[in-house]
Every structure is written in C-alpha cells, then in structure tokens.
C-alpha cells in the first residue's frame, strides 16, 4: 500500500501589521496677508498656534490666536523689542 503524506504550506508569508500609516490634515497656518498689502476690517492677517506674532495697532487676536484687522488699511509686520514681532494695520489717509 502506498500512503502519501501530503502537507500544504503557505506559499506567501503573512502580511503582518504596522503602527504607521496615519497623518493629520494640514492646518494651513501662517501669513494670510503680506507686508504692504491693503486689507479690509475683519480680514485674517496671520493664523498661528500660540503667539508667534503679537497684535499691534488696529489688530485683534481671536480665541485660537488668529490675528485679524480691526480697520481697513495697510499691513505692516514690525519688530517689537529685540526678539518679538508684531503686525499692525495703519488706516489709509483719505
């Protein structure tokens, strides 16, 4: 009697898993208005997390630290002391 011992093995190894493969959406932070640009009141000037840039004249700070123009005018990015920066909006003389 001829008994065959047939054993089947996987011809490919298991795929395994990884802890990578995810990423968060970009938050589109940074300057939204350039130095010297004319903006209207309420325009967003700079989106940030924390206070990288401080609000200057005629600029407000939102709850998420976004800087926005309070009046219509020209945007100016300026130094505030030795190591800080601020953005101001100066009204256009009519």
UniProtKB/Swiss-Prot annotation:
A GO MF term: structural constituent of ribosome
Cellular component, GO, one term: cytosolic large ribosomal subunit
Disordered: annotated segments: 11-33
Record InterPro entries: Ribosomal_bL27, Ribosomal_bL27_CS
Pfam assignment, any one: Ribosomal_L27
Propeptide: 1-9
Biological processes annotated in GO: translation
Free-text description of this protein's post-translational modifications in UniProt: The N-terminus is cleaved by ribosomal processing cysteine protease Prp.
Assigned keywords, A-Z: Ribonucleoprotein, Ribosomal protein
Source superkingdom: Bacteria
Ribonucleoprotein among keywords: yes
NCBIfam families hit by this protein: L27 (TIGR00062)
Family indicated by similarity: Belongs to the bacterial ribosomal protein bL27 family.
Name of this protein: Large ribosomal subunit protein bL27
Organism listed in the record: Streptococcus agalactiae serotype V (strain ATCC BAA-611 / 2603 V/R)
Lineage of origin: Bacteria, Bacillati, Bacillota, Bacilli, Lactobacillales
């Amino acid at each position: 009697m001829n008994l065959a011992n047939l054993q089947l093995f996987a011809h490919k190894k298991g795929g395994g898993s990884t802890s990578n493969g995810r990423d968060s959406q970009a938050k589109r932070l940074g300057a939204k208005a350039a130095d010297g640009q004319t903006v209207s009141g309420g325009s967003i000037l700079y989106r940030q997390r924390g206070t990288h840039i401080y609000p200057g004249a005629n600029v407000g700070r939102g709850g998420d630290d976004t800087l926005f123009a309070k009046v219509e005018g020209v945007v100016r990015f300026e130094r505030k002391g030795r190591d800080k920066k601020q953005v101001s909006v100066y009204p256009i003389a009519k």
